[in-house]
């Protein structure tokens, strides 16, 4: 079977020897017995017990592997405190064997980065192993529905994913320590390169934001691969030392901190609809607060905590203004009075004056506070929705040129429309919905045509990120919780597509996809498209993305093993003789550990081994080499009565989510003008041909045509005119087909060529041939007798 072959190709041999995988072959034998004896109730029990036992073994292995990776990352983080500015050759084994001792040695930044890459590589291999086990269990349960009479019934089958849940083993702490290591390495390299330290992280920046941002969905299986691409370049940005806090409290560490927002709208959801329509000046008003890190109660808010009053205004490009977000802070106890219009802003102004704020800043504050309050009262806005998530931000201090945020555990909660006479609902029984993916937002501050960093281009184009432009938590929450009501006239384009599988293992790399597939449907359209534009792959990868390579080294596994053995060696030495120096320790122990440290030859496996196996055996859920429809339309579901804004949604190559596109009218007008030019010339040729047929006279041919057959002498003008009409009709058909093919390509907005490859070439050669033949005929008539010496030439 394809999955069986793909599974054998996807496993890591070294992990398999350690018992890291569900044994699919043994489980498949049980499934075959179930298929042969379909009514035997004992077989599902046998399968369940077998899966549970194997999951227990895998969970134990995952637990030990996470501890090993944490030990490695912690040792590297301690060693990164002793980075040297000089790239002097160092024995890494000696450095890591002395970590934590008084004789710790300095580590060059390049070696620290190399070890961090090795740990990242092993961590991603662990994630791939875990994901393959999940895919295996899902495949087994799916086959049970085919072979068992009633399928996997009972609560135990529903909860099998919760038993020995290896996904619950957090790797956030490992990513945090690796982020710290990369940050130290980048700081040392920056000091050596520029002679000055970089901007410290965690510094509070401006409160006015003006960025271009792109949002992506990331499946939770693929999130570690995205984080691993970010931390070598951007450190985790936090306002508090959450890692130290988690150690003090004895609670698990998480990369993100809770963020909650309460959105305001009226009974008819006016702001929601204006936001979806992308009207110029569309406004969004919300109250946002930042929860305490590591606190399980995200709704907890004390009276002295700050709540930010925020307003977001959308502006179209033609208006000359940029969309912006502005905000100011109030204490929680003052929010209700502010919304009612009973709060005096004089104390806030006095506080600004005490901080030596300029008159312009004071005026901006008053203008913003008045604008938000005016809109709340003018549109009768009420609290309608609350969004909550864990946000991890990656940014280099005050440098906001690149900022990446990752929102996980996103949930949307219904508010009470102000019935409690409070700015937010404090009850615990509100309707709630969880968003299935992580939301990654890449925020850039750069000029329109400025080239961004290659690693950013590689990240934005990798298959782990599913681009969903203009994704809005507020729009998603309203459509999810209120989409069935008659007040919602339209829903966002992504709502009918939430069930699409966006896992990276089920789709090829963007730059490896043939962008011409799927544009045309039917044999005729495909044939004409390939005749006009060719069949070769287009350049779908940007120059910057092609320059960036993730984990380019080929010795990551060997480096990992060497450092791991050095750390174990140091731990053993410290446990045997903690008070002895390395020179005083027995030589027999040194020799024994040196022998244990000798490495066997290792193979560098790919971190995307599972994806390559799925690709080789065509385990994609969609047809990758056939033709899908160009447009997506909703055919059912609870949003069937609502309009999917806006209209038909074109299919973007290599991506699962189809995104509405905006088209520049000049693009389509240029294509039409191209067709009109060809049609104009074809019409002239056709009219001349018709005139030759109607008014031509073959009797007026030159005297040297007298010897021609009488039929051709009588009908030469008809033949000539007919040929001209046929040529004109062919040119008209060609112009129309080219126009339609180019329009489809413009509509699909793909990175492929729009130019006509064969038409101009053929036209050029035809004109050259006509000119050459004409010149040759005139030369032969005038100089032929002289050159040949014959009057009959």
UniProtKB/Swiss-Prot annotation:
Catalytic function, reaction form: [phosphate](n) + ATP = [phosphate](n+1) + ADP
Chief place of localization: membrane
Binding site for ATP: 215, 286, 288, 312, 325, 391
Pfam families named in the record: VTC
Domain of life: Eukaryota
TM spans (from-to): 685-705, 718-738, 761-781
Membrane topology listed for this record: Multi-pass membrane protein
GO cellular component, one term: acidocalcisome
Residues binding Mn(2+): 441
Stretches with biased composition (Basic and acidic residues): 586-595
InterPro entries: VTC_Complex_Subunit, VTC_domain, VTC_sf
Compartment annotation: Acidocalcisome membrane
Entry keywords, A to Z: ATP-binding, Manganese, Membrane, Metal-binding, Nucleotide-binding, Transferase, Transmembrane, Transmembrane helix
Side Cytoplasmic, residues: 1-684, 739-760
Annotated stretches, region: Disordered: 575-595
Vacuolar side: 706-717, 782-793
Cofactor(s) in the UniProt record: Mn(2+)
GO molecular function, one term: metal ion binding
Stored PANTHER family: VACUOLAR TRANSPORTER CHAPERONE 1-RELATED, VACUOLAR TRANSPORTER CHAPERONE COMPLEX SUBUNIT 4-RELATED
Subunit structure: The VTC core complex is an integral membrane heterooligomer composed of at least the catalytic subunit vtc4 and the accessory subunits vtc1 and vtc2. vtc1 is a small membrane protein without hydrophilic domain. Vtc2 and vtc4 are related and have 2 hydrophilic domains that face the cytosol, an N-terminal SPX domain and the central core domain. The central core in vtc4 is the catalytic domain.
Notes on the domains: The SPX domain has very high affinity for inositol polyphosphates. SPX domains may integrate inositol pyrophosphates (PP-InsP)-dependent signaling to adapt cytosolic phosphate concentrations to different metabolic situations.
Official protein name in the record: Vacuolar transporter chaperone complex subunit 4
Gene (name only): vtc4
